[in-house]
Amino acid sequence: MALKACITVIAVVYVVQVVRGAEKSLDSDSSGEDYELWTQGCPFLVAENRTGFGTTVSCQHNCNGAIEKVPEGEPCYTIGEDGLGRMKLNLPYNCSLGECSGGVCVPNGRSDVCFKRTWEENNKAMA
């Protein structure tokens, strides 16, 4: 349970960094509002690359009975939340990259080294 809480907190911190640092709007709907993963309900889980950039590991999830989806075309790792849960902390993994389409992370033929991090590791990096 504590591990899930730590992963959720990490996801929120990284998503905030990604959303606030984005130069473009992440939402293509007609409302004109920016899509912010951390304010729309439940945070999406992320894995980090070598530079500490967090990328979602799934393009949709259940949030208190409602299905939430990452916007079309956003980058993702195809490992899913279960894959992230099986990863060992701070060990490098070869993760397949993709783009979100209809709530599914569709592989794009590329891969990247990714890591599962902890809240403590994130705080050290931010200090």
Swiss-Prot record:
GO terms for molecular function: C-C chemokine binding. The keyword rRNA-binding does not apply. Its main location: secreted. Glycans are attached at N49, N94. The keyword Disulfide bond applies. Salivary chemokine-binding protein which binds to host chemokines CCL1, CCL2, CCL3 and CCL5. This is Evasin P467. GO terms for cellular component: extracellular region. Disulfide bonds join C42-C63, C59-C100, C76-C105, C95-C114. It comes from Rhipicephalus pulchellus (Yellow backed tick). It holds the Pfam family EVA_Class_A. It is found in: Secreted. Residues 1-21 form the signal peptide. Keywords: Disulfide bond, Glycoprotein, Secreted, Signal. It comes from the Eukaryota.
